[in-house]
Structure formats: C-alpha cells, structure tokens
Amino acid sequence: MSSAASDVYKRQISSWLGDGTLGIMITNTQYKQGFYTAKEAVIISVCFSLVSLPFSTVIADQLGFMHIFVPFYATVCIASLACALIMPRVYPLNKFKDTTYNNVEHLKEDLVPKGANIFNFGLNKAINRASNAPSIKDILVNGFKTVIDMYIGLLPLVMAWGTLALIVAEFTPVFKIISLPVVYILEFLKIPDASQAAPAILVGFTDMFLPSIIVSGSEINTMTQFIVGVLSITQLIYLTETGAVILKADIPLNLKDLFIIFLTRTIIALPIITIIAKFIFA
C-alpha cells in the first residue's frame, strides 16, 4: 500500500474518531517528510475526511434527527464520496503538480516483489520501520509540541471567526444578500423555505455549527433542516477548524482555493443530499 493511500485511511480514522484537524496535521507531517507530493497532500486534505462521529451526533441532535441518525450520517458519507471522486479532477485541485515539499526526495513505497508473500513482506517492512523509529518519549514530546503549537496558534483565530460570523449572520443582512443566487438554486431543486435556508448554506464556510444553529431556531421545513444539516457536515472547509489548520500548515492551499473548494463541494453535494432527503421524507 502506498504512503498516500495509507494516509487516507489514517486521516479518515483520526477524523471519524477524533477531529478533522488531526488528519490534516498527519497529512502535513507526511508531506514535509516527502512521503507524497503537493497534489497528493492537497487532495487528501480536502477530500478524504469527514466531520467526526461525535460532532455529527451533536448536529443531528441540535436539529432533532437523532432518531434517523443512521440515514443522516449515511447521506453524509455518500455525498462525501461523490465529492472525493469529482474534486481531484476539477479546479483548483487539478492545478497542483506532483512536486515535493522544498524538493525533498519523494519517498515512494516499495512494491511487493513478484511471488513474495504479502504478509511476510509487510511484516518485514514494519519491523524495519519500527527499528528506525524514535523512542516513545520522543514521539510523545514531539506530538505534544505539535498539538500545543497548532491549537494555541489557532484558538484566537477560531474564536474571532466564529464570533464575527455569528454576529454578521444574526444581526446583519450580509449573508441574505450574498446568498440570493443560492435561493434560485434551492427553488430549482424544489427545496422548501429556500430563502431562509440559503444564508445558512453559505455561512458554513466560517463554521460548521452555525448553519444548524440558524435553521434550528426557526420554523423551517423539516426536510430543509435535514438538507442544511447534512450539507454543513459535507462542506468540510470551515475557517474556524479545518480551513484555519490548512492555512497554518505547509500544504499549498490559500484562502481563495479554500473558498472555491467550499463552493464546489456544495454544488456537488447539494443535489445528492436533496435526492436522498426526498426519499427519506417522502
């Protein structure tokens, strides 16, 4: 299995059970060490991750969907899979090249020799890797330093973005104005209460929880609340979480790229989520 493929699994596991930011930190470390290219790092960072199961239950509970949490989260997985299949083939992800960080050597994994036993080959590779690994103390110290540096550096930014976005969403018409094109898209998809749901869809770029807060506190159609809740998880790029970590990391993505990725994921996922929601609430 290649480093890029194994990192996809590590990233998904860390995201499902912990936090999406942990997956990005793993990706960034592997990228800097030369295990894969800029293109691989970017795709892994913005495609192969889901909001953690615990936080997904928080969103489902906020919207009153805990009784249908399995189809709720299954819809997230289906829409996210569609995004992962399409996103690497469109802008901006298709612009990145197979170059390494600071031109370090690209550490490609060895292929299994013809006729060799896969288990024995993998076991020998694991033993060799373990023999060169740092001590447990070094691993813990380096991991602690990385986490502290990441979260202390991000905490002020996260609080600032979250507070500002909530103020703008609740007390100004900014999101209502910029979401007018989204209203027409929702109406085309025959989603009820389109004018109320549209601002919640765009505000997801700032924080994943704000869309659910906005639609749960109003008399919006239940199916529309389901669509907004699932979409807020599937959008994946939030300035108060994954977006901030990506911008702080060495992965070659800027704010413009993140916003385009956010919009692209929304465009891909929205019709899929809507179709599934219409079946669930038929």
Label every PLM stretch briefly.
Residues 34, 90-99, 168, 172-176, ...:
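Membrane-interfacial segments
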Residues 18-22, 50, 177-185, 204-210, ...:
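Hydrophobic alpha-helical segments embedded in the membrane of multi-pass proteins
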Residues 2-9:
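Short, small-residue-biased leader/transition segments that mark boundaries at the very start
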Residues 9-18:
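Helix-loop-helix module between adjacent transmembrane segments
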Residues 2, 93-146:
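Intrinsically disordered, low-complexity non-transmembrane regions of multi-pass membrane transporters
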Residues 30, 34-87, 208-282:
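C-terminal transmembrane helix pair
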Residues 1, 128-220:
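Transmembrane helical segments that form the transport core of multi-pass membrane transport proteins
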Residues 18-21, 77, 155, 159, ...:
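Residue-level signal for the membrane-embedded core of alpha-helical transmembrane segments
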